[in-house]
């Protein structure tokens, strides 16, 4: 499963996925610190054509250079050559057209594809919707939030274990079937 996701931001739309965020200027030549939602974090640099989104304004830009810096990342973008310009884009989301994402093998999914799916048990009971996912050492975990159709108001954490817990993912129907006891 690929970890490129939309994070918790609203800049994501039907055509774009949020890969990360520009956090603050770095130095005086227009470099910016980058917080990446990709796994590994350097994966954000595999995409040279970015769309920056901040407060409803969008700007297409090209990645000139990117590199690790300490525990994070820094990037230089074409057209942003001073600290003042970098400050204007600090806090911007880094978007990528979904069509630019690499194709995945059957049974693999990007996290953003799973977010919002209705989650049902093998017996057809609705547990809620996938709100978001997070990574643990052993496996990824789905956070299932209650919805209007869910059988109760409980939030659940389900391990993303294909064939064991996750029995079927139907993106077209917007549904995931899980082998999970609703009482757990």
Curated annotation (Swiss-Prot):
It is found in: Cytoplasm. Keywords: Chaperone, Cytoplasm, Ribosome biogenesis, rRNA processing. Signal peptide: none annotated. Pfam families: PRC_RimM, RimM. One of its GO terms (molecular function) is ribosome binding. The keyword Cytoplasm applies. The keyword Transferase does not apply. Its main location: cytoplasm. One of its GO terms (biological process) is ribosomal small subunit biogenesis. InterPro entries: PRC_barrel-like_sf, PRC_RimM, RimM, RimM_N, RimM_N_sf, Transl_B-barrel_sf. Residues 106-184 form the PRC barrel domain. Binds ribosomal protein uS19. The PRC barrel domain binds ribosomal protein uS19. An accessory protein needed during the final step in the assembly of 30S ribosomal subunit, possibly for assembly of the head region. Essential for efficient processing of 16S rRNA. May be needed both before and after RbfA during the maturation of 16S rRNA. It has affinity for free ribosomal 30S subunits but not for 70S ribosomes. This is Ribosome maturation factor RimM. It comes from Chromohalobacter salexigens (strain ATCC BAA-138 / DSM 3043 / CIP 106854 / NCIMB 13768 / 1H11). The lineage of its organism: Bacteria, Pseudomonadati, Pseudomonadota, Gammaproteobacteria, Oceanospirillales. The gene is rimM.
